Amino acid sequence: MSMVKVIEVIASSDKGFTEATENAVAEASKTVKNIKSIYIKHMNANVENNKIVSYAVNANISFEIEK
């Protein structure tokens, strides 16, 4: 039987939601092993002068706990 733990993270990008999601996994993987999935809870974009300047995701990352 495996155990899975979930952490909540926020990540951003100036290029898009896909890159923000990839940044979330990349940063989490620096300290967490065995990442299995990412669930995007919220997405938002910051706007300045009628243009999107950054994208952000609030996500849950699931990873398997080693025994």
Locate each region found by the language model.
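Structural motif
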Residues: V4, I38, S54-N58
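Short, well-ordered alpha-helical segments
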Residues: S2-K36
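A cross-kingdom feature marking charged/low-complexity
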Residues: N44-K67
